């Protein structure tokens, strides 16, 4: 028997910005981001992970909070989208993923797109 009850799905996600010693950078042309900002879903990029974030969204966040040459760390790399976005922006990126299948899928996902961007 199937359940007819509605399933609730969250309509937002939270992010953490970790920094050491001094306040984080904020490269947003003087505009504030108060509690949230809207983003259009990315339905074009193939999904390799159930909680995969859109690369354009991650690129925007990385642009705001880092400069070229900075390091971006993703402790739960999943699809590798954060690593791809960081590489596209000239940041060094390190990701960690405990699940071997996700690691393998993310590795293919990121490397194929980095190689595409090198030859375009």
Predicted segments with their positions:
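Short, flexible loop motifs at catalytic/binding sites
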Residues: 114
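Core catalytic lobe of class I
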Residues: 1-95, 99-103
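Conserved hydrophobic residues forming the short capping helix/wall of the S-adenosyl-L-methionine
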Residues: 110
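Conserved SAM-binding loop
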Residues: 106-107
């Amino acid at each position: 028997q199937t359940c007819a009850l509605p399933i609730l799905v969250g309509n937002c996600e939270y992010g953490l910005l970790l920094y050491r010693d001094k306040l984080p950078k904020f490269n947003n042309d003087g505009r504030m981001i108060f509690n949230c900002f809207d983003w259009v879903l990315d339905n074009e990029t193939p999904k390799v992970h159930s909680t995969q974030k859109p690369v354009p969204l991650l690129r925007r966040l990385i642009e705001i909070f880092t400069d070229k040459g900075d390091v971006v760390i993703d402790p739960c790399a999943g699809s590798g989208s954060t690593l791809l976005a960081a590489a596209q922006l000239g940041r060094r990126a390190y990701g960690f993923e405990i699940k071997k299948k996700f690691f393998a899928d993310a590795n293919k996902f990121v490397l194929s797109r980095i190689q595409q961007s090198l030859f375009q």
